């Protein structure tokens, strides 16, 4: 309890409120006594525990609180007294003689506590014989045992009478102040978040047909509250809901009860229900409930999830929504009694759907707050002694049980529960997780619910199925209009969404850029004089120059020329180029230098500018001659090599300009460091391909090579932009891939992506041969063990995926919310060529990736401005995709040669992730487009922005005739993409489709088609037999 902070202002207000109210409690008690023994985590809703939390904000075990009209006595240990004494002293000083709080210290000394209890009993007896108690509370411990002995003696000796004050306490706690209402909002939002998590896990289990029990699924959700990564996500959302001056503290967030999941066939709609141990049934109705408490203030939410529901289920669920709305908006009003509320709900059912009244719950909720379910204020037809007040908070829970589907006969139940706060403005629902039928209904089986009628033998006519069969030719003829209408509707929705995305893109572009963002075409780029020095002082010049010969100083990047008997240094950066030639007995070398205004100034020379001034004089060239030809050739070679070295070093500096120096990796010195062994890394710091180990440390991860201790890669969590886990399904390797915010150095190489992988399978060898030696050598890979081998392979792959997934999640958890694991969706992938070869690209939640073959592809979708689909033409088998980024200085990303069959899917995917796209029939010159855009982005958007690409949009492409497209000869860098399709290029399905469309009007043409070889051979054989008999 080292971090206990008690709000003594709240303590004072609530203690005085208790002092003022308790004489009017049932039984008219003259004093109150509440004793708490050892903490009971299994039952946190006992009245004495709630009183501690209401007064102090904490539960103080082994503590007794006695309240009188003139004061209060607290008996507790010396350790707990330290948290109270300073605040209590200030309260006593403030209250003076009107009310006094006394702190009595208990101890473990024999007889000490008995003496305190006897003194207290004497005070109680003096106050009066009626003593208010929480008679239903049950605590254990030595402190309780000692008190019971003294109390029982006092009852017999002094005639003290204990009266139950549970109802009085309930009425005192019913109305919530602003602080309590804020805590209820925090806990309710927490319930929403955990219900969202529960629904995701539930739907995934049903969709993937995972074999799991209701209780096990409940445990999985319950354990999420212990994961810091999940809790840190909650902090930004829950902090604004906290009372003024308080910060959200995850340590005070806890379950009010274990999550409840019920998938039938039996349901329990009581708050005491438990998740069953039966397998999760993914049909019909699944009931789910979550309850979170923050600083001991409880909230509750229950939802019904409909899985492939019948019309009757959905109709009854819609009525349940209306019933809950009726209770909250019309029946739950200030001054109403629980009986009036419940009877009003029953009357509503009888007037609308009387057949449901038999299965209606026995109550529609209860008062809640520090106590999850206040038994003194249950909303049923028996409670007419309490009235709803402004400031009350209720768990409105209702449902129908023991329902039977008239079509299938299956049993099901429906339930809804929400936390509702009564405010001056009316009821306010604090739990906002969706309950709309469209959002909680899931359809995994699209086939007919009814059974197929058996066709009678007399009937020769086949009936048309109510749903088109994908394998039936009826799909492509009679029922073609059904699927086409559905596709047209989806297309219209997609076009409307794209129109909104383009309008949003144009608005944001105009807001993002102003006139000042434009570059002045007449203005030359501002250059900065690059200073360099060969020597600061003359004493640094080498002594060898005394011989008045040409010298090259490699250390200082300088060559020294003798001019008029003096050594003159020239830095290599001032040297431009040179030449050497021989004339007669002399060898000449000409040295050219950089200077401003030199004709033919290139981009490279501008990178080494000088300060241009009339006062400055420059040497543009020098010519030296000597009879020592070998010496001059050697000098010229050294100067040339020095220049090459300088240029190379400058280029490396430019390449590494965006490399940010990382902080040091803080190694984990305490506890066990998580590690993953036998890991290969790409790119590798070693020349040899050897497996190493990855460690998770305090602020990052480290890959350590086994060859050398200094051969390692350190990656800080703060520099991780994306963390991907890609399982080995459909691949030969399992991958953990890290995409960095800023590149890091590996030796002298700059890297932006680091990948850890392990091969998923060993080489399998199968040899034929009957030799005993061969059979022994390859006995596990023979034909007779093929099934066993495949099963073993699947098991290994599953274990490998599990190991890597756990390690990736461990990395994310160790980052304290800085990193999240992203997974690719293989079912949404497509083939493309982002670099040199065709690869399989897959979307993730936030990116489009290709991680199997280097160079890797990682496109962060949040950074994409627009996507352009190029070379979309009739007759072409593939198209290209270009991503333009919001940072216009960043090069665009190309993914070429995507199969044309993926076009509609990619359009839908781009729309789903809110990326606007346009369609073009040609490849665009992106270097020119991006340069003009960077020159004046404001004018670009004033002129319509990306609308200039709309000439190839879906609307226009749909109206383009086949002749118009065929007349255009596309200019493509890859002519192989535009070869004329042969007959083999058309699929069998396409031929069927064309023939089916014309089957009614041109059925007579089938006889004119050529016959296949089998038919011709049969005819030839028949003709031969006929000729033989004729002979």
Swiss-Prot record:
GO molecular-function terms, A-Z: histone binding; histone chaperone activity; nucleosome binding
Record text on subunit structure and interactions: Forms a stable heterodimer with POB3. The SPT16-POB3 dimer weakly associates with multiple molecules of NHP6 to form the FACT complex.
Acidic residues bias locations: 953-1015
Protein's job: Component of the FACT complex, a general chromatin factor that acts to reorganize nucleosomes. The FACT complex is involved in multiple processes that require DNA as a template such as mRNA elongation, DNA replication and DNA repair. During transcription elongation the FACT complex acts as a histone chaperone that both destabilizes and restores nucleosomal structure.
Entry coiled-coil feature ranges: 478-499
Record family assignment: Belongs to the peptidase M24 family. SPT16 subfamily.
Domain of life: Eukaryota
CC terms in the record's Gene Ontology section: FACT complex
Gene Ontology terms: biological process: constitutive heterochromatin formation; DNA repair; DNA-templated DNA replication; nucleosome assembly; positive regulation of RNA polymerase II transcription preinitiation complex assembly; regulation of sister chromatid cohesion; transcription elongation by RNA polymerase II
UniProt region (Disordered), positions on chain: 450-501, 952-1031
Protein name: FACT complex subunit SPT16
Localization of this protein: Nucleus; Chromosome
This protein's encoding gene: SPT16
Keywords attached to this entry: Chromosome, Coiled coil, DNA damage, DNA repair, DNA replication, Nucleus, Transcription, Transcription regulation
Bias type Basic and acidic residues, positions: 450-460, 491-501, 1016-1031
Organism: Eremothecium gossypii (strain ATCC 10895 / CBS 109.51 / FGSC 9923 / NRRL Y-1056)
InterPro entries assigned to the protein according to its UniProt record, in alphabetical order: Creatin/AminoP/Spt16_N (IPR029149), Creatinase/aminopeptidase-like (IPR036005), FACT-SPT16_Nlobe (IPR029148), Fact-SPT16_PH (IPR056595), FACT_SPT16_C (IPR048969), FACT_SPT16_M (IPR013953), Pept_M24 (IPR000994), PH-like_dom_sf (IPR011993)
